[in-house]
């Protein structure tokens, strides 16, 4: 059972949650002065239109027609499926639906904001985009966006994933991007981390630092970010806006679930539904799932911290493990991040979103079960959501109650098979930090 919308139903506007948050965000701070940052400084890092979107109080922002055509080209609208085989396998009265972002040409949700960021950079006359990537999904998406819009792309890929997922690197290179393992010898930041540990596995925080250092050396370059900031999460709301329309063909969800690293795929599905809760129109349960190896939501502190490991970015008020937190080399590379989207942090603080965490072994076990039932191999990141869905469906079975579950299957795992191989061979290790000193 599935619903596929026609091209003409691609959303015409993104949803911006800022005007609807239960409290306003605290302003980002200048890393040098610790005062609210001058917006003009952000324009040296990001494309100007993205800076405007980041602080906009408009509830809906129009998606340019040219960009909607590109969305169609890469596979939007994406399908929404009912997981009937999984329901039968679990023997649950719950009905399970998933929005499948793996149907895009790059295999994940990341292309939704990659195209938007590249589009606005091109309009401004920017020639080169530089970014970080964890598992490689974001780097792949920006590489294709650059190819489609005529921009050069350079990607700093967390070294653990660079080694675990060599074909992601190959795919980025096919699309024309330069790819460096991070930490690298390409930047002063990278050299410093390599001096501390020549075999450093890297992290999203370190890769962000390298990308920003790179950008600041080139006036014609700008930084593109794959998660965390509001404009990135806003671009992803095409997922939830489509899903709301598709679920009208089925039924109203009770529970909405997504995995979380920085927060973009969770927000993409959930925020259009969160609006209904904030407006008092509906009651949904929102579950955000993270790895126990990077327990930002479940064990982090809500405070100002840098978005990168070297302290080059503005400080954001968010849930954080501390920007120098050593993130273990789990296979869900896209979730190896110390911080969290400020907007999602606020929703967690107000009890609107419930966070939970799992070990990677139990996550891969759930992913294999899902693959056997539905035929789709989830990305290791998305598999965290699958684990939560299965647990919720089993809860419904124990309590003998009907329940409608909607989750975001944010990407496929066909280029992440080393993690699955390690799981099947009994080689996966679980990581959970004992102490989490946060130094902002």
UniProtKB/Swiss-Prot annotation:
UniProt pathway annotation: Amino-acid biosynthesis; L-tryptophan biosynthesis; L-tryptophan from chorismate: step 5/5
UniProt keyword Glycoprotein, yes or no: no
InterPro entries in UniProt: Trp_synth_b-like, Trp_synth_b_CS, Trp_synth_beta, Trp_synth_beta/beta-like, TrpB-like_PALP, TrpB-like_PALP_sf
Any single Gene Ontology cellular-component annotation: cytoplasm
Keyword match Amino-acid biosynthesis: yes
Cofactor: pyridoxal 5'-phosphate
UniProt GO molecular function: L-serine hydro-lyase (adding indole, L-tryptophan-forming) activity; pyridoxal phosphate binding; tryptophan synthase activity
Entry keywords, A to Z: Amino-acid biosynthesis, Aromatic amino acid biosynthesis, Lyase, Pyridoxal phosphate, Tryptophan biosynthesis
The protein's role, per its UniProt record: The beta subunit is responsible for the synthesis of L-tryptophan from indole and L-serine.
Family: Belongs to the TrpB family.
Name of the protein described by the UniProt record: Tryptophan synthase beta chain 2
